[in-house]
Amino acid sequence: MKKQISLLLILLLPIIAFAQTGKVFDNLSMKSEILKMDKKYAIYLPPDYETSDRSYPVLYLLHGAGDDQTGWVQFGEILRIADKAILEGSATAMIVVMPDANTGQRGYFNNIKGDWRYEDFFFEEFMPFVEETYRIKGEKRYRAVAGLSMGGGGTFVFALRHPELFSSAFPLSASCGPLNMDDMKRYTSRAGMEDATELEIETYFKKHSVPEMMKNMPDDQKKQVRWFIDCGDDDFLYEGNSLVHIEMRKNGIPHEFRIREGAHNWTYWRQSLPVVLSFISDAFHQY
């Protein structure tokens, strides 16, 4: 009898493993009136999404420059890593949404002239669409944002601009925007900024320099978001991330800051992703 039970369990293992697998869809789209085009996105649905009626927390996971909504799927291996974290209990079951910010114009922000309004699209159209389409808990405590490089910059600015919407933010190897006004010179050479006025440039700096935004954060916002900043010791963006950490320390903004061995590549970010999922899950739980 014991041998029969053992054999049955062995035969059932592939079925059990299959049942514990989430799903990824990486070529979905929604129509944007703000951007006047269809915008693609990818989504990870946890293993029990199709067999339950429950709603889930959500992570908005932002890609870097040169990638699109498929980056975290193809290179970041979100399906394998999220499934493993959920199965092992280091992360709670969640939905992961990965928007495209590489089509039309690259980036997560409104451009300086205001004729490309990605940030407005994200908050006014994309988030409401996603959270109405999927079974997502629509409260701040169940919503987080993370991203790498350009997406790390988006993570910083989105959570700084909307601390009422995100419980946690986890920028990886983040592009921290112009670090000072002199640094703005390299930004003005970008498309759409060549003819910007001095006032437009100064306004852009104040709204997109992460160290400057941290420096000017109101006291009542300093504990609204749980922060975790992660950057490799061989990453060319180490300076900006270190300066942000220093400003946060000076201004009494609670956060975690890690410099680990590694560079600006997918090997580093795949290693970071389980930590991201665990950290944001702490906020999703009651604590």
Features from the language model and the residues they span:
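Sec-dependent N-terminal signal peptides
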Residues: 4-16
